[in-house]
A protein has these predicted regions:
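Canonical positions in the second alpha-helix
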Residues: 52-53, 86-90, 123-124, 157-158, ...
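Short coil turns that delineate tetratricopeptide repeat
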Residues: 24, 58, 92-95, 129, ...
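Start-of-helix register in tetratricopeptide repeats
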Residues: 28, 62, 95-99, 133, ...
Length: 293
């Protein structure tokens, strides 16, 4: 499965965090065994081994971080947040403090703890001011915290470093529509050229008043694509149709499309979590859907 390849890569990227204080001690051996089990898809075994590593060296903050990463990849967000909180309690050096707040902020967002996510993202950005324009995650959190002015300003800054992303234009629109009305949001829709992801340019046209929901869905289903690619294209169509209907205050249609997006949330990274959190915060029923063929 491509998912496991990705997760194994992520685990290897973070492996240096997990180096035990005693390189010949039991903790490192548990970490190595946990990483191996994870790569083989033996997730329960990996979690047990990571827990044993922490038990062997409970004051080694790197092991708690490793455990948090493992829980995060397995979408166990409450346990991930708890592990990152333990890292911070062990008083890491400045850079690791910031990185841990970023990781915990993402976990908090995925738990629907929006204000807590913003607080953690703020700590990260204070430590790394140059990351501010890159931080679209904080912009999305601002939307769900009803801090719409801060939201559209965040996406305006993000536009300076990510010029061809329809999603940035849409989230800017959504925040501006809530702050100043949909008429002004349409007038100030950020122009995007060159987002090659289907159906994102059609989504942009919809928000600009130059397309329709039916055309967005047709574009997502077009081209003879099947399987995971079709699911991904429909996921983005459903998510942004749901957000469009939220902006136009059509609650029934919003719920329909957000529900469809949330139904496959686990397959679509952070934006999948956005769909799921949106459904949870608004108590939107999530249907069971069959895999796209």
């Amino acid at each position: 499965m491509k998912t496991w390849i990705y997760l194994a890569l992520m685990m290897s990227l973070n492996f240096n965090w997990a180096q035990a204080a005693d390189k010949d001690g039991p903790a490192l051996k548990f970490v190595e065994a946990a990483a191996k089990a994870f790569r083989e898809g033996k997730t329960d075994e990996a979690l047990k081994l990571a827990a044993k590593a922490v038990e062997a060296e409970p004051k080694n903050l790197n092991l708690h971080y490793f455990k948090g990463q493992l829980h995060s990849k397995l979408r166990q967000h409450a346990k991930a947040a708890a592990a990152y909180t333990r890292v911070l309690a062990l008083k890491p050096e400045k850079d690791r403090v910031a990185d841990t707040h970023q990781e915990r902020g993402e976990a908090y967002f995925k738990l629907g703890k929006i204000k807590e996510s913003i607080a953690d993202f703020d700590v990260f950005i204070k430590a790394y001011p140059r990351q501010d324009p890159h931080h679209w995650q904080r912009g999305i959190s601002y939307y769900y915290a009803n801090e719409f002015k801060k939201g559209y300003e965040q996406f305006e800054r993000h536009q300076t470093v990510n010029r061809n992303d329809v999603e940035n234009a849409v989230w800017h629109f959504l925040c501006l529509a809530r702050a100043k009305g949909i008429k002004e949001a349409k007038a100030k829709l950020i122009p995007i050229v060159g987002d090659g992801r289907v159906p994102m340019m059609e989504v942009l046209a919809l928000f600009g008043g130059k397309s329709t929901p039916a055309k967005v869905l047709a574009k997502a289903r077009g081209g003879g694509v099947k399987g995971a690619r079709l699911e991904r294209q429909l996921f983005y169509a459903h998510l942004y149709l749901g957000l469009w209907y939220e902006a136009t205050k059509e609650k029934k249609l919003r719920d329909q499309y957000i529900g469809l997006a949330a139904a496959v949330a686990d397959n679509h990274d952070y934006m999948g979590d956005v769909a799921r959190v949106h459904a949870e915060l608004n108590k939107i029923p999530v249907p069971k859907v069959k895999a796209e063929k």
